[in-house]
Amino acid sequence: PHPPVWIPGSGSLETWDWVLDRDYVYCYLSYFGYLRGLRVVQGFWDRVAQRGIDDNPHRLGFLQLVCVSETDASAEAEYAEHVKYFYRKMLRIHPPFAESPGYRSIRSIRESIRPQIGEEAQKAAQELEWKDFVDQGHIIAGSPATVRDQLTEAAKMLRVGHLMCLLHIGSMPKDLTLKNTELFAKEVMPSLKDIWSEYLDPWWPQRLNQAHPAPVGD
């Protein structure tokens, strides 16, 4: 026996089949958000259909950067510098390491699934400002109501059952990270829990029926 297995990926076509062969969860780790990620995710669901496998949304996980504040304006004031730091500084990887020979198959290259790190990704983000990051879906940010609405849209658009929200971004300090996490947990997450509730989720970890916890040590 083992806990459910979740496999991270960035668009390799072979990973889709490897995951489906083993009935694991495929987790697309997207730094550029749900609008750009839709093409890869749709490719995954197309492959699921081609293989005659059920399209339970919980087969898919998706990483989305999220910033929550009291209002849309305060979200920009609090998070903009840290988001810019992330995209302009933290995706810097020497090109030969980001796209080394043999790292991706010819099949994946032909499908034009581009890497999210390295020189190309860095250049693409250099000129973007807060409004661009929001409008292009790189981040979902704003008041709790704004974030709830956009995450609901993203979950349904992608048909994703395991929405993984990245709440510490770039140079974000501890106090702001805690605020982001608390606002998300209290004012956003409860509204998202029933999305896809009509589907069973066998890939979510379950507690052992006959567990015998060890006593807490001194």
Summary of predicted features, one role per range:
Residues V5, V19, F44, A75, ...:
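Conserved, mostly hydrophobic/aromatic
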Residues V5-P8, Y24-L29, H58-L65, L163-C165:
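Hydrophobic faces of well-ordered beta-strands that scaffold small-molecule active sites
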Residues P1-P4, V134-D135:
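Short, proline-enriched alpha-helix->beta-strand connector loops that line the catalytic pocket
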Residues L35-V160, K193-D218:
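An alpha-helical appendage that flanks or caps ligand/catalytic pockets
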